[in-house]
Structures are given as C-alpha cells and as structure tokens.
Amino acid sequence: MARYRGPRLRVVRRLGELPGLTRKNARRAYPPGQHGQNRRKRSEYAIRLEEKQKLRFNYGVSEKQLIRYVRRARRATGSTGQTLLQLLEMRLDNTVFRLGMAGTIPAARQLVNHGHILVNDRVVDIASYQCRPGDVIKVRDQDKSRKLVQANMEYPGLANLPSHLEFDKNTLIGKVNGVIEREWIALNINELLVVEYYSRQA
C-alpha cells in the first residue's frame, strides 16, 4: 500500500488528531460518509486496525515500511511498541518536523527530498534516514533553503521541542542528544494494539 496523498482532513475525521499529517482540525467529529454519525460497536480487530492506521498516516509511511519497522522493533530489546514509536520518531523527516523546520511531516519530507537539509555537514535526501544521538541537523547554506525553513518556522506544527533535541533558531542548527522518550510523542496512540495487529502478519 503506497503513501497516502488524498484529502488529509478526511483522514483526521476518521482517525482523530494526527499532528504530523496536518495542522488543521476537522470541523465534524464523526467520520466522513453517509453513515459516519451512526457508528456501530467496533470489533477488536477494527480497533487495532484503526490504531495501526493512525501510525501510518501520522508518520506518512507505507504499509511495507511499517511492517519493516515492526520487525526491527521486535528484534530490539525492551518494549516492542515503544521501540516502534522511537524508530518512527527518529526518522529524519519527523526530526526536521519536531525541530520546527516544517509545519507537518509531509512538508519536512519535501525539505529533505529536495536536498535542503544537512546531517553532519552532508546533504541527506532520504526521509527515512534514522537519526542518532550526536547527529547535527542544519539547513543548507543557500538562500532558498534558509527562506523556506524560516517561513515554515513562523507556523510550527508543534510548539514544544522534545527533550532529546535542541535547536538554535538564529543559526537554524539542531542537534540530536538522545532517543525520544515516550512522554514526548505527540500522537495519541496505543502502540500495543499496533503490535497486536501485526502479531500474525509481520
């Protein structure tokens, strides 16, 4: 399943607030469609599926990518669900978003893909690059790159900078000081349900 490129508010109405996907809030609290207001009691499978979809749409990853992340999380020590969230949060596109350089993860991905972002003084144009403690993330020293990020910073997606990151707004340089802690993950998600969803599939 490819990355979603359709109407974002339609997804937000169905799944709830997704801070990485869009800054806008749905005006209607019920899902789209003719029967959106008349939701029947959902099965356990439907609930697990919805949590999985939240993860996919918020971080903008395909189904194949998410399965790979689940497999990596299983191989690691500790909580599979928490490790899964950390892997997604430490992606370069999400890190650029959390630093405030872009208002959404899709906007951050575009900055990365177009070569506007340097990691340790090298252009990294792969959005899925896994950031590590010690990485220095900065804007490319070109007028176009700096203007794009400065414009984005006027309307940041999330106000609070996570404790594992630091960012200098004057130099547009950020640093990764560690791995994100669970309490700093902005998405309202039950990651255990996602792990259960993939228990027989990944």
From Swiss-Prot:
Q: Tell me what this protein is called.
A: Small ribosomal subunit protein uS4
Annotated InterPro entries? Ribosomal_uS4 (IPR022801), Ribosomal_uS4_bac-type (IPR005709), Ribosomal_uS4_CS (IPR018079), Ribosomal_uS4_N (IPR001912), S4_RNA-bd (IPR002942), S4_RNA-bd_sf (IPR036986)
Q: Which domain of life is it from?
A: Bacteria
Its gene is rpsD
Organism listed in the record: Gloeothece citriformis (strain PCC 7424)
Q: How does it assemble?
A: Part of the 30S ribosomal subunit. Contacts protein S5. The interaction surface between S4 and S5 is involved in control of translational fidelity.
Q: Which GO terms describe its molecular function?
A: rRNA binding; structural constituent of ribosome
Per UniProt, the keywords (alphabetical) are: Ribonucleoprotein, Ribosomal protein, RNA-binding, rRNA-binding
Q: Name one GO biological process term.
A: translation
